[in-house]
């Protein structure tokens, strides 16, 4: 599923040489209803993106780095996995549960991009 989603993201031109991405589960409101989704969080030069495409759901939501406060890392005690918390300037937040060890690299890259936008 992970590889398929990356291939689909590539066809939508969401990935480039400087893209960082991570796969996991998160809750998102679709048509006013909260849904547990499994998809990609993508960080490229232009935007931070939630992406999911399957037979049931298509989600492509882009966020400007200027609207993001920070991407935090924590450990989920319940699931014993890492979680990333994307916090926006308007106090909205999203949490992604990730199973792989790439959370550190992904969070560092995203926070570098947020800081770069702040300094510009």
Q: Where are each of the predicted segments found?
A:
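Canonical phosphoinositide-binding patch of PH/PH-like domains
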Residues: 88-109
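Generic hydrophobic/packing signal
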Residues: 72-75, 88-90, 110, 114
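Phosphoinositide-binding peripheral membrane targeting modules
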Residues: 32-83, 92
């Amino acid at each position: 599923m992970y590889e398929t989603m990356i291939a689909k993201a590539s066809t939508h031109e969401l990935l480039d040489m400087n893209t960082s991405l991570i796969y996991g589960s998160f809750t998102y409101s679709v048509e006013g209803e909260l849904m547990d989704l499994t998809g990609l969080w993508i960080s490229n030069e232009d935007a931070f993106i939630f992406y999911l495409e399957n037979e049931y759901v298509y989600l492509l939501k882009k966020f400007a780095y200027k609207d993001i406060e920070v991407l935090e890392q924590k450990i989920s005690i319940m699931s014993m996995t890492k979680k990333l918390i994307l916090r926006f300037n308007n106090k909205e937040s999203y949490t992604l549960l990730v199973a792989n060890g790439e959370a550190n690299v992904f969070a560092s890259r995203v926070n570098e991009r947020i800081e770069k936008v702040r300094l510009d």
